[in-house]
């Protein structure tokens, strides 16, 4: 947001204003000419945004300034940098920038910002290159500034928003560019206008004949000829004339484009794009993919909202963005009521579909031809119909239809009660809950809500008679229990109803509640019978002769499945149901994903049979799933095509309250196109046993969910045939020639839905006992593409033609079977429910003797056969067998010969291991490895680094490697795309260059070991390439790393475009959804963490340490969603890089830094794993407030990132254990994998320690402790679950009195999930009431009933509109309904409506919804209401308050376009004119004054927009504000001052403000006795001082003198306040002093101001403010002014005595870091002047600084400024070197030579160079071996450091011992001689001096001659510098 002209920071407190910051200076007092991006990085990492930079000091003579990538929003007031040549501001968030005064500017970089207009560049006469690419430039004003640039050659306008008509483009852009005669390079690339017009490039070439390059492509002669030809033929003029007659209509600029098209063309439905959520993704898969778009009036939208424009995302995010409710099952006492449905949309939707079946199809837009063809074969009657795409409302409606459906025989029993109008009629006919029809319930609740009378018509926004949470609870109970609670009736009686009426209602309701409770208790023992839900709309016209009972779908967790298969007869296959979306009841947003039932392509209609439950017997309590019966089918002998579907409509009156979590399915005919693949865990069909013994209790500690796989014809109810499922073989892939595996799921589908566990008693008997037959429908076989179908058909024909193949040996036959594994077509495999295994049997699972040994024997035999085959085959290689033993094939069934022993019945159950995640595409990996082997065997041998050796099969020749583009950086190499043998691969190029024989041998050994590691969660190593560069070859993966998924939001935003552009291709649409839309959900976190732990467990089991485990090394496959770990192994390379570069990574364990990578083990990887886990939850960088160079020290000091409270307990404790400083205390990855393999619900439960203390409920005179209350049934707690917390009832039903809830109860209630659940229900009811009333108002005159309904809905919203409830109101269409009601403008509800909108608009998301719904349109009418009545004035006042809230910068143009700005300006003009004429009524005057106050306050925000400023100035608003500034009312003057502050920088009114004498008026306000006026005037002066012209005017008007007087008065007030102990006065004076000092600091940037300030005795006042006990806030504002005055000589002489005070303040150990740094800066400035050295020496400042260096060893800022002070002292006067030595600073300097921070290292070198001039310090440095340390830095390229080094060496040369060290170090001598070649005189002088000293001794001559010093000296002997010439000749004579 641009804050131009405003001191107020957005979303900050009122007293929060801009903080001025300065760049650090290497040496204080020296001129700075260049600031690179790395130089300014520390200041941006330290301070919080926004950062405001002051570069106006004289020391900043910048020629280059690079502020890229710092999120800056405004760069202005750079005019004083008149020597600046290069200004680089790329990759920021700039909206405002100013280059005025930059007369030397040559290059201006502004790419990738948010600039939408060009500012004045008239001062930049030398500007050559401008980069404005990647901004938001349109065809607006500002391009004429280019015409003033006489030197412009390069202009880049690519990737902007230029999309205007060709005439405007020519007039506003090309015409100014024509005036720039030097323009040669121009780019309009990636602008919409470029592709909008024909021959656009030729048009620009014709308009700009001097242009050489357009879009960075050379303009050829042919293009110029063609452009001239088109111009001569009149082509361009014709285009311009056509455009001038027919203007271009930009549909993208019309926010209501969809609605407009829908209104203009009734036959076309307006298409709205759903927001990409898991719901949209799931709905696209339903019905074979479906269309990617929805309609504006679709089946999923609420049928009650008619006549309102449909918004694309009205409800699409309401379920997804809502925070998960962690306490969905926290109240066991409400289980009976919570199990009932609370949705009110189902019946109306059902009636709507049944009464007008054709309307549904008309409201759905036509789909693509692909979808039509998919349904053509099986649905001849609905060829033109398309399956609808489900929005979140559709999903909710499907849930209601699935739960409340009725059979056809029960449909006749429905009675509609549409004429019920009063509550008394409903109460007279009230029935128990189970007997109410849906329509009766909805009508009753509607009237019940309408009759809840408010307590007060003027109900406040955030207050109510009843607490809002209690009110919501009562309202929720009224809806759930079909009765009005007594408390709510009592409150209603207080407002409108009489006591007699209330008593009658209570007397009638009480028996009804009794009947309801009895009905509820009886329903707990007899579960409701599921009914068949209605078919989808497109299938309602079909009919099926035989209705099918429903089939229940239970999604079982993959890791908990145990499959025990049964022999299946392939001739008998059951019928499969079609897709029915259903919701899984769970307390997270992932639970709202739609689950579906896949279809098989079977076309038979067999008779049905149902399974029977087993006879009751003693059972053990075992956790089981609540399921429905499964239908079995017997196929008929003939095959027919199902063409009809049973018509089902209506619902049973007894089945209204069907449980939400029961999933049912319909059985319409099957579509011809198969659905996308789904995980096996999503398609298990479970049989339902008797549910009579089902009891709802909290779940036990461990859940055992065990489905069973299918039965065939041989299975009977008394004797089921089962076979054991052996443990998957490790080395042999499972293959079956007769069966097929269950198709896997597409990525992104939910693999572990949450299921409601119940206790079911299972007989503790052996498995020999007879079991009932369990048959489940098979899963559909995915239909392959056409090419694959043809290939499979050909293979099947070949197999039929050759049924028997003759093999020469058993080995050939086995290998033939292996080769045919991937192509053999298989049939679907049925799965049935597995019998429950008692817990005690599981303990003996290791003792079971199963046929698994036989499988292992067969496997080993097959291994021997394969080895024998390879031994006899000369052309095969060991890698060729890797495909057959890859673990990815383990999930396939074992080959038939091996499968025979398994089919025998077993005596004991065999536990199946946890299923692994989906494997990576290993076929591509094997292809790479196979090609490497084959090609290397073909080549045989080659030259590798000059050695003729035999080439192993895993080494790729360098001529077979093609290196592509670079992907990124790794821990020890760079990754590139490429090809190996023309196969896409990933190539990692090693960053090391040490290609010794030892290194190559170690590397090849590592490759041979690493390539043997094969795991599903590892990126394998296929081979390597040894050439001049070393490459590691990996298979190519289409994957994203975890760093990108967590921190780059653009990865998630691409899904919208993919859905819009790929509606005609279902497969592409699904792939794009999966590739570009990754939700960081709990499911995702669990999958990633478990995948990493499994991979690391495998690596550690092979003694491989990763040592670089971080986000970038974790890949997520875009196709399969599999988790892959890369960059493992090769630790000898990583250690070498670490030791040389000293990497500082937050993922490295402390022992890696302590031991310098010499001692670490596998436990080091757990540290990086902990950091990854933390970032999965926080989605933020680690140690983001700490400089990267200090991360290592931070970790070594035991500091770790903070773990948020929302991290589950399991993960929180796991993170803390993994990042323990003691590596032996960290858990192994095997333990971690076991922890993460627990049930999903358990590991994501909150910590038991976070449970809330048992609340105390006060009911009348009795106090009840909830811990001893017997009302809750869930007394048994569950470890790790929040279900152990019991919420007591609100009132005591025994006493019948209303309970007063304590604060503890309300706090607990707000933290549970019940509040969210009830809030959703009530808000849906409120939105329905508002929408119904709005729809009736749009069609006819609104009735009184509708107005009353709106009033009651608004009243409920007022009670619920607290900030904590705002999140539940986002995305439900509430603000759109309120906006639509506002357009009606009903006088009865406008004031109440405004109050509600104002309270809700305090939430940013809700305010944006209101604006997007067109909220400024009704707001403009409310603002302009000018009636004299008090009601109208109140409405206008509320509207202006609402405008103040909505006036955000991105929406300010709406204020101008809707006429609000003009209305407010006219109010100002009228107000000021009436006051001058003495007008204004007595009664309305006060109201008008209040309205004007609010209007002026809102104007201070509206005028932040430049266009708004211009219109306000044109309409005469400035003069009105100036008149208000002189108003006697302080409030109005203050607000007018703030509004004028926004206009100060506007060029159109700058002269007007100056001529109006605003500065003298400000001076008058500064003298005002009102403190508030003075403070605001100071802020305005501070803002004005940033403008050079106003700054001069303020100084001329003696503003500084006035400020000094104010400062003195405030200082005296502070002293008076302290003496009298008046804290309030003291605080007021402190605030005034800080504001005055800020203004003075802004004005003192001018040298003239320094003299004026000195003459005003301002320095004397500042000296009074300096003291040891001075307040920190005053000191922070004082020292910036203090530093400015040190550069003024006269002021410095007065300030020098205060050095002792500065040092005294510095000695305070509790001083803030910012104050310490400021004082060090001041002392450094003093030390640069020799006149101040004496005071510094007397102040003992060196001793204090020495203490600071020791105390703040780990503080980067204090350390660097302390070293600068010491360096400055040593530079000016070496007499202080003795003091520096005595204080022990020399050792600190030596220690800092190898500091990790380069700036500290450089400063230490600089300080040492100044100190070596002292003989005593030089001797100490030689003793500490400092000179050889300096030799290590001789290769630096830093010119300043090179100068310091040659300076130090020239003094070290004076000592004989140092000469010996120099003589023995040839690099040192070479460095000295090389300095003779530099053009800087200082280098030549110091080098000549050093050589002259060394040449004095004969022993040094040989070393000097060895580096060629003779030649250099002969050149310098003819130098123009007389001194250098004489010295060179003298040295030559000595050397000769």
Curated annotation (Swiss-Prot):
Residues 191-230 form the LRRCT domain. GO terms for biological process: signal transduction. The keyword Repeat applies. Residues 527-538, 774-785 have a biased composition (Pro residues). SMART domains: ARM, LRR_SD22. Residues 961-1241 form the Protein kinase domain. HEAT repeats lie at residues 325-368, 439-476, 574-614, 617-654, 1317-1356, 1512-1549, 1553-1590, 1598-1635, 1690-1728, 1739-1775, 1780-1817, 1821-1858, 1863-1900. InterPro entries: ARM-like, ARM-type_fold, Armadillo, Kinase-like_dom_sf, Leu-rich_rpt, LRR_dom_sf, Prot_kinase_dom, Protein_kinase_ATP_BS. Residues 310-319, 660-673 have a biased composition (Polar residues). ATP binds at residues 967-975, 988. The keyword Endoplasmic reticulum does not apply. Residues 253-319, 347-386, 516-544, 599-620, 660-689, 702-756, 769-809, 1050-1075, 1261-1308 are annotated as: Disordered. One of its GO terms (cellular component) is cytoplasm. LRR repeats lie at residues 61-82, 83-103, 104-125, 126-147, 151-173. Keywords: ATP-binding, Leucine-rich repeat, Nucleotide-binding, Repeat. GO terms for molecular function: ATP binding; protein kinase activity. PANTHER family: SERINE/THREONINE-PROTEIN KINASE TNNI3K-RELATED (PTHR44329). The protein kinase domain is predicted to be catalytically inactive. This is Probable inactive serine/threonine-protein kinase DDB_G0278909. It comes from Dictyostelium discoideum.
């Amino acid at each position: 947001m641009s804050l131009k002209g405003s001191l107020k920071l957005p979303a900050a407190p009122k007293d929060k204003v801009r903080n001025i910051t300065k760049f650090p200076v290497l040496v204080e007092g020296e001129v700075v000419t260049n600031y690179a991006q790395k130089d300014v990085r520390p200041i941006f990492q330290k301070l919080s945004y926004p950062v405001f930079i002051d570069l106006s000091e004289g020391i900043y003579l910048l020629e280059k300034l690079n502020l890229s990538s710092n999120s800056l929003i405004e760069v202005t007031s750079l005019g004083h940098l008149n020597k600046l040549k290069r200004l680089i501001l790329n990759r920021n968030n700039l909206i405002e920038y100013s280059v005025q005064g930059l007369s030397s500017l040559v290059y201006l970089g502004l790419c990738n910002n948010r600039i939408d207009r060009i500012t004045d560049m008239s001062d930049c006469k030398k500007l050559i290159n401008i980069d404005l690419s990647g901004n938001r430039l349109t065809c607006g004003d500002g391009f004429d500034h280019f015409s003033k640039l006489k030197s412009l050659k390069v202009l880049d306008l690519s990737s902007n928003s230029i999309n205007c008509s060709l005439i405007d483009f020519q007039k506003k852009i090309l015409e100014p560019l024509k005036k720039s005669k030097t323009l040669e390079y121009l780019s309009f690339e990636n602008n919409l206008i470029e592709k909008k017009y024909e021959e656009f490039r030729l048009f620009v070439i014709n308009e700009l004949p001097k242009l050489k390059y357009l879009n960075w492509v050379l303009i050829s002669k042919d293009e110029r000829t063609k452009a001239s030809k088109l111009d001569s033929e009149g082509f361009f003029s014709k285009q311009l004339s056509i455009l001038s007659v027919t203007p271009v209509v930009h549909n993208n600029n019309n926010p209501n484009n969809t609605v407009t098209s829908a209104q203009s063309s009734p036959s076309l439905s307006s298409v709205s794009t759903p927001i990409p959520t898991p719901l949209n993704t799931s709905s696209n898969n339903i019905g074979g993919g479906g269309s990617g778009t929805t309609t504006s009036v679709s089946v999923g939208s609420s049928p009650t909202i008619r006549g309102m424009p449909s918004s694309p995302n009205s409800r699409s995010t309401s379920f997804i963005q809502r925070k998960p409710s962690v306490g969905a099952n926290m109240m066991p006492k409400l289980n009976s009521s919570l199990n009932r449905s609370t949705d009110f949309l189902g019946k109306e939707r059902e009636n709507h579909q049944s009464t007008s079946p054709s309307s549904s199809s008309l409201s759905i837009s036509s789909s693509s031809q692909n979808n039509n063809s998919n349904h053509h074969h099986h649905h001849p009657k609905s060829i033109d119909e398309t399956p609808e795409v489900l929005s979140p409302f559709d999903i909710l409606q499907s849930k209601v239809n699935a739960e409340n459906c009725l059979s056809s025989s029960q449909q006749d029993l429905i009675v509609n009660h549409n004429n019920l109008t009063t509550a008394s009629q409903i109460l007279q006919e009230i029935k128990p809950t189970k007997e109410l029809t849906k329509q009766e319930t909805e009508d009753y609740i509607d009237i019940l809500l309408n009759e809840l009378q408010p307590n007060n018509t003027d109900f406040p926004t955030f207050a109510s008679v009843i607490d809002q949470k209690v009110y919501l609870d009562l309202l929720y109970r009224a809806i759930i229990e079909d009765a009005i609670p007594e408390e709510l009736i009592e409150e209603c009686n207080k407002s409108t109803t009489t006591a007699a009426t209330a008593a009658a209602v209570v007397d009638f309701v009480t028996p009804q509640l009794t009947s309801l409770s009895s009905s509820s208790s009886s329903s707990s023992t007899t579960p409701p019978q599921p009914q068949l839900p209605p078919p989808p709309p497109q299938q309602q016209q079909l009919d099926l002769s035989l209705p099918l009972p429903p089939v229940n779908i239970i999604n079982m967790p993959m890791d908990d499945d145990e499959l025990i298969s049964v022999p299946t007869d392939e001739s008998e296959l059951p019928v499969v149901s079609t897709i029915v979306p259903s919701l899984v009841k769970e307390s997270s947003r992932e639970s709202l994903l739609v689950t579906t039932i896949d279809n098989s392509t079977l076309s038979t209609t067999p008779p049905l049979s149902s399974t029977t439950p087993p006879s009751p017997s003693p059972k053990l309590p075992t956790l089981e799933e609540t399921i429905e019966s499964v239908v079995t089918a017997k196929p008929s002998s003939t095959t027919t095509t199902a063409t009809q579907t049973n018509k089902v409509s209506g619902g049973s009156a007894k089945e209204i309250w069907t449980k939400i979590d029961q999933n049912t399915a319909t059985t319409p005919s099957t579509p011809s196109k198969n659905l996308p693949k789904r995980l096996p865990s999503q398609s298990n069909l479970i049989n339902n046993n008797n549910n009579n013994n089902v009891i709802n209790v909290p779940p036990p500690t461990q859940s055992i969910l065990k489905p069973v796989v299918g039965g065939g014809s041989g299975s009977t109810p008394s004797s089921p045939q089962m076979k054991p499922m052996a443990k998957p073989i490790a080395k042999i892939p499972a293959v079956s020639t007769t069966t097929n595996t269950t198709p896997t799921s597409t990525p992104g589908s939910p693999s572990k839905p949450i299921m409601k566990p119940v206790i079911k008693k299972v007989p503790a008997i052996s498995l020999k006992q007879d079991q009932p037959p369990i048959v489940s429908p098979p899963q559909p076989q995915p239909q392959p593409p056409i090419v694959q179908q043809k290939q499979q058909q050909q293979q099947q024909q070949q197999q039929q033609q050759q049924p028997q193949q003759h093999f020469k040996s058993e080995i050939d036959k086995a290998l033939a079977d292996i080769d045919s594994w991937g192509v053999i077509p298989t049939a679907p495999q049925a799965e049935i429910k597995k019998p429950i295994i008692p817990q005690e049997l599981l303990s003996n699972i290791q003792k079971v003797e199963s046929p698994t040994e036989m499988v292992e024997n067969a496997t080993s035999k097959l291994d021997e056969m394969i080895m024998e085959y390879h031994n006899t085959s000369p052309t095969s290689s060991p890698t060729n067998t890797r495909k057959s033993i890859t673990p990815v094939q383990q999930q396939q069934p074992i080959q038939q010969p091996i499968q025979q022993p398994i089919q025998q019945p077993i005596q004991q159950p065999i536990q199946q291991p946890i299923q692994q995640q989906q494997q990576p595409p290993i076929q591509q990996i094997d292809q790479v490895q196979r090609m490497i082997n084959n090609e290397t065997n073909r080549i045989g041998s080659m030259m590798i680094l000059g050695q003729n050796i035999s080439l192993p099969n895993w080494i790729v020749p360098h001529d077979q490697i093609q290196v592509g583009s670079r992907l990124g950086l790794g821990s020890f190499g760079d990754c590139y795309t490429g090809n190996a043998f023309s196969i896409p691969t990933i190539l990692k190029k090693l960053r090391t260059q040490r290609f010794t024989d030892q290194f190559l041998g170690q590397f090849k050994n590592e490759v041979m070991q690493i390539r043997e590691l094969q795991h599903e969660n590892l990126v394998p190593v296929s081979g390597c390439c040894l050439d001049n560069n070393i490459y590691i070859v990996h298979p190519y993966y289409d994957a994203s790393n975890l760093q990108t998924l967590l921190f780059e939001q653009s990865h998630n935003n691409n899904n919208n475009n993919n859905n819009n552009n790929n509606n005609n291709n279902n497969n592409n649409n699904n792939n794009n959804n999966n590739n570009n839309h990754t939700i960081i959900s709990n499911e995702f976190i669990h999958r990633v963490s478990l995948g990493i732990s499994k991979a690391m467990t495998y690596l550690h089991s092979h003694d491989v340490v990763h040592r670089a485990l971080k986000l970038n090394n974790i890949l997520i496959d875009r196709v399969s969603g599999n988790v892959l770990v890369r960059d493992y192994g090769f630790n000898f390379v990583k250690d070498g890089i670490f030791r040389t570069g000293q990497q500082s990574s937050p993922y490295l364990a402390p022992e890696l830094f302590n031991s310098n990578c010499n001692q670490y083990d596998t436990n080091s990887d757990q540290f990086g794993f902990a950091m990854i886990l933390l970032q999965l939850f926080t989605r933020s960088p680690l140690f983001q407030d700490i400089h990267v160079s200090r991360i290592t020290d931070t970790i070594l000091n035991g500091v770790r990132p903070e773990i948020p409270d929302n991290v589950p307990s399991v993960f929180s404790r796991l993170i803390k254990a993994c990042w323990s400083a003691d590596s032996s205390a960290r858990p192994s990855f095997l333990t971690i994998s076991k922890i993460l393999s627990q049930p999903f619900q358990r590991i994501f439960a909150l910590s038991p320690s976070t449970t809330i203390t048992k609340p105390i409920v006060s009911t009348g005179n009795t106090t009840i402790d909830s811990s001893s209350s017997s009302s809750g049934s869930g007394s048994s707690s569950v470890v790790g679950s929040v279900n152990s917390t019991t919420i007591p009832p609100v009132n005591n039903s025994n006493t019948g009195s209303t309970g007063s809830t304590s604060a503890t109860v309300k706090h607990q209630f707000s933290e549970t999930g019940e509040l969210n659940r009830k809030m959703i229900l009530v808000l849906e009811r409120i939105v329905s009431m508002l929408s119904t009333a709005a729809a009736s108002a749009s069609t006819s005159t609104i009735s009184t009933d509708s107005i009353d309904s709106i009033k009651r809905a608004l009243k409920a919203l007022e009670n619920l509109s607290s900030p904590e409830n705002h999140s539940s109101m986002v995305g439900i269409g509430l603000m759109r309904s309120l906006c639509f009601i506002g357009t009606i403008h009903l006088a009865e509800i406008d004031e109440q409506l405004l109050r509600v909108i104002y309270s809700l608009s305090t939430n940013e998301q809700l305010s944006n919804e209101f604006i997007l719904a067109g909220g400024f349109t009704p707001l403009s009418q409310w603002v302009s209401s000018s009636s004299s009545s008090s009601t109208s004035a109140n409405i206008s006042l509320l509207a202006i308050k609402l405008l103040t809230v909505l006036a955000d910068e991105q929406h300010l143009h709406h204020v101008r376009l809707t006429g609000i700005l003009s209305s407010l300006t006219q109010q100002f003009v009228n107000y000021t004119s009436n006051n001058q004429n003495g007008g204004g009524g007595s009664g309305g005057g006060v109201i008008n004054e209040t309205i004007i106050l609010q209007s002026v306050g809102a104007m201070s925000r509206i005028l932040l927009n430049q266009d708004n400023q211009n219109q306000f100035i044109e309409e005469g608003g400035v003069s009105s504000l100036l008149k208000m500034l002189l108003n006697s009312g302080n409030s109005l003057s203050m607000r007018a001052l703030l509004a004028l502050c926004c206009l100060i920088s506007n060029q159109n009114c700058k002269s007007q403000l100056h001529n109006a004498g605003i500065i003298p008026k400000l001076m008058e306000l500064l003298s005002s006795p009102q403190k508030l006026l003075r403070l605001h005037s100071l802020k305005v002066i501070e803002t004005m001082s940033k403008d050079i012209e106003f700054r001069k005017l303020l100084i001329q008007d003696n503003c500084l003198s006035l400020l000094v007087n104010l400062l003195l008065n405030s200082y005296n007030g502070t002293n008076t306040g302290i003496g009298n102990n008046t804290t309030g006065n003291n605080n007021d004076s402190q605030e005034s002093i800080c504001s005055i000092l800020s203004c003075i600091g802004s004005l003192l940037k001018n040298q003239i101001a320094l003299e004026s300030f000195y003459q005003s005795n301002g320095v004397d006042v500042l000296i009074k403010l300096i003291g040891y006990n001075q307040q920190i806030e005053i000191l922070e504002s004082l020292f910036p002014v203090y530093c400015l005055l040190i550069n003024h000589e006269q002021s410095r002489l007065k300030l020098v005595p205060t050095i002792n005070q500065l040092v005294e303040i510095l000695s305070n150990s509790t001083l803030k870091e910012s104050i310490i740094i400021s004082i060090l800066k001041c002392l450094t400035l003093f030390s640069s002047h020799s006149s101040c050295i004496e005071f510094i020496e007397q102040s003992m400042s060196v001793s204090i600084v020495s203490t600071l260096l020791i105390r703040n060893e780990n503080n980067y800022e204090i350390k660097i400024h302390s070293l600068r002070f010491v360096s400055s002292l040593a530079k000016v006067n070496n007499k202080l070197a003795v003091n520096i030595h005595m204080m022990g600073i020399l050792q600190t300097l030596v220690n800092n030579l190898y500091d990790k921070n380069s700036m500290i290292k450089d400063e230490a070198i600089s300080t040492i160079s100044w100190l070596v001039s002292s003989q005593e310090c030089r001797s100490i440095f030689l003793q500490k071996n400092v000179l050889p340390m300096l030799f290590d830095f001789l290769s630096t390229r830093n010119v300043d450091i090179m100068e310091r080094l040659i300076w130090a060496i020239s003094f070290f040369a004076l000592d004989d011992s140092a000469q010996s060290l120099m003589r023995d170090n040839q690099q040192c001598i070479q460095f000295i001689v090389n300095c003779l070649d530099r053009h800087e005189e200082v280098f030549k002088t110091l080098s000549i001096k050093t050589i002259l000293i060394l040449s004095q001794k004969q022993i040094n001559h040989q070393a000097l001659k060895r580096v060629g010093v003779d030649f250099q000296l002969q050149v310098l002997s003819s130098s123009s510098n007389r001194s250098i010439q004489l010295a060179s000749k003298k040295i030559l004579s000595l050397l000769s």
